[in-house]
């Protein structure tokens, strides 16, 4: 089959690092090509070379059979290559239709914007995606999942021949994911080629026809998905067998450290639970169940309307994240790029940002040598892959950014560490490293709350699991009681903790 798009022998180097070496990718009409590899394998760099953001150092790009070089995203878009980025690229203050047709609005014969046509065309695109809202709604009023769907509608509006989807389901619910897959199947029937970049094995085996594997910037293999198993694909990605994906540390927890009684706040209704020293408490539930809201009320980012929180026997009141930090409660956000990291700052600055009081003299000046030593120790301990601590953190892979975010939380020497989706957007190899770090913290007696949408992760890592449903606690299970079935039953409200007991 003739490929719509072919990249062969692509090289790309940056100061101190060779990002791509002999990389290759083919995209075929009417087929979905998965592009997989650990974070830092070169997937994002390859997409930037393809769309003209980066100039390739060597190699060829064939588009519809002709050798081509795109000068930037606009030229690749106009040629018929659409890309849906992992980071949403929308303007919250504009309507959905205005976002979709930004810069190419429909104009009537008097030179004025034809709003009626524009909204009608945008509504058609939303209907194609089976979405329940109209295009006159402000993007800022949508959930992250719905905003992702608007991104997809925007790319569809260009009638692209090849569509690149970078982690498209990262923020989508199961229903939204099913809508996306329905659209992908429709696009295949229309003869479009799709590049599907994802870490989610289940999705790759469900929706993709072929898979290209990158490792350390090199092309490893192109295979038909049907010829592979999950284990064989992971082995190609990491270059080794992953024996035990969730390395649970079997160590009995200590005394109660945190006690939460009848906690209420935005999206949180009368929640009570305990957390022990050296315990990993998993928090499960569907998207919108109130898991993140519960954590934000707990550490002070959302207002607490009633209830009590006791830490080591003393009542704590957290009216702001600073109060949470001061009391030894650290929260690592699910959205590290919005809430967690300052992308323009260096690895060192990001890591030490909340712990500067430990490196400050009485007069307020910094003890730079102490700060550098601490950052250097954490980089080594966490195996953060970076050319230096002065590197801008935005240039690191997702897994390495996440390690820096966790290290920053630990620098403040917390008693309770809340990890909200700690492995979202992180590849299989880096996930295992993060799990091993979590176990290390547990062994040191740290109390950990692990919030995750990935049930195998919650089941594999937790000592005890609580489940949220519509702002309430709908279940609490020991490690032995917990299965995917009971967690899902509690998550949809079919089972409550009283039934279980």
Curated annotation (Swiss-Prot):
Record field: catalytic activity: D-ribose(out) + ATP + H2O = D-ribose(in) + ADP + phosphate + H(+)
Keyword entries, A-Z: ATP-binding, Cell inner membrane, Cell membrane, Membrane, Nucleotide-binding, Repeat, Sugar transport, Translocase, Transport
Enzyme class, first EC level, given as a word: translocase
GO cellular component: plasma membrane
EC number of this enzyme: 7.5.2.7
Residues binding ATP: 37-44
Gene3D superfamilies in the cross-refs: P-loop containing nucleotide triphosphate hydrolases
Membrane topology: Peripheral membrane protein
Matching InterPro entries: AAA+_ATPase, ABC_carbohydrate_import_ATPase, ABC_transporter-like_ATP-bd, ABC_transporter-like_CS, P-loop_NTPase
PROSITE patterns found in the cross-reference section: ABC_TRANSPORTER_1, ABC_TRANSPORTER_2, RBSA
Every ABC transporter domain range: 5-241, 252-495
GO molecular function: ABC-type D-ribose transporter activity; ATP binding; ATP hydrolysis activity
Subcellular location as annotated: Cell inner membrane
Family membership: Belongs to the ABC transporter superfamily. Ribose importer (TC 3.A.1.2.1) family.
NCBIfam families: PRK10762.1 (NF008030)
UniProt function note: Part of the ABC transporter complex RbsABC involved in ribose import. Responsible for energy coupling to the transport system.
Subunit structure: The complex is composed of an ATP-binding protein (RbsA), two transmembrane proteins (RbsC) and a solute-binding protein (RbsB).
Descriptive protein name: Ribose import ATP-binding protein RbsA
Species this chain originates from: Escherichia coli O6:H1 (strain CFT073 / ATCC 700928 / UPEC)
Annotated gene: rbsA
